[in-house]
Amino acid sequence: MSSPQTTTELAAVADALRSHDRFLLITHENPDGDALGSILAAKLMLDALGKNSVMYLSGAAPLPAEYKFMSLDGLRRQLPDDVAERVLFALDCANESRLGEGQAALEPAPVVVNVDHHHDNSRFGDVNLVVADASSTGEIVRDLVRELGLALTPELAEALYVALVTDTGRFQYANTTPKALRLAAELVETGADVHRVFQSVYETVQLAKLKLLARALDRAQVYEGGGLVVSYLLKTDFAEVGAAEPYSEGIIDFLRAVEGAELAALIREPPAPGRPARRVSLRSSSDELDVSAIARASGDGGGHRQAAGFSSELEIPQIVDFLREQYLQARAVARA
């Protein structure tokens, strides 16, 4: 985070946080560890500044069970009545659509602050801090804490550690930079409980989630000589095994681990009524294959080079055809 643009943006966000008193913290629907860790860390950061802030999450899906150990009791599922009086502070949201029902707060909010690490971020904020080479949004929040002259606390460190460890895949993904590892050491030294985080996030598995995983693995198919692995989950699967949509998180990592796979895709039908009809998660095993470009080609998606997703109204066979075509194009670009 040493580029002149990043330094300028960091200072601008810090100034916006200092100069306002009331905030609405928001992250993307179907949140992952980076989203939840970042929003909690931002809440603790604003508390330390003496600010009034509330956390909000769009959608009706329950929080993933693995994150219930976090201090998220104050997380609201309905927008507060005083939205027009609060700065909208968006974290880990690549674009407005990722806010879900929270998009309704964009217009009345006096100021929109956008902090994110997705390289295709639409920069929808009045004040933007987008650092594409950051390992996680949590890493950027740590730099904000430093810019504001605040000290790390064990609670803040643990929230940031959750963001960091999950978005780097337990420090295995290509975004595990030297800075990310130095940050991990700092957070542990400050008091982040590594064992508690590991047990909660990675060893808390509901039986329904295992049954959902079994169905996805049973349906997995390989295409294009084994370079593309695709599976799917139906709305009825969630109902029959008693699973909520967040239970599907992490399944795609098993698909990506298939020998020879360059691109993995999990198509799922959200169990809740309404749109979209289907969501698709994408993962690549190499930084050479940009899955965010595939997600954008769908017309309703985006993300990182190695982890992205999109929504679709197409039927599953049509989505598979789209993925096969896009995979071949992406592979040709990568090998050109």
Where in the sequence are the language-model features?
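Hydrophobic helix-and-loop "lid/oligomerization" segment in the mid-to-C-terminal part
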Residues: 2-29, 37-65, 84-85, 166-298, ...
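Solvent-exposed alpha-helices and their adjacent loops that cap or buttress functional pockets
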Residues: 16-17, 80-83, 104-107, 121-122, ...
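Short glycine-rich anion-binding loops that position phosphate/pyrophosphate groups of nucleotides
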Residues: 30-31, 93-96, 118-120, 235-236, ...
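Short, glycine/charged-enriched secondary-structure capping and boundary segments
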Residues: 38-41, 69-71, 102-106, 127-130, ...
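Active-site donor-binding segments of glycosyltransferases and PAPS-dependent sulfotransferases
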Residues: 57-58, 62-79
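Active-site cofactor/cluster-binding pocket
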Residues: 71-127
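Short alpha-helices
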Residues: 115-184
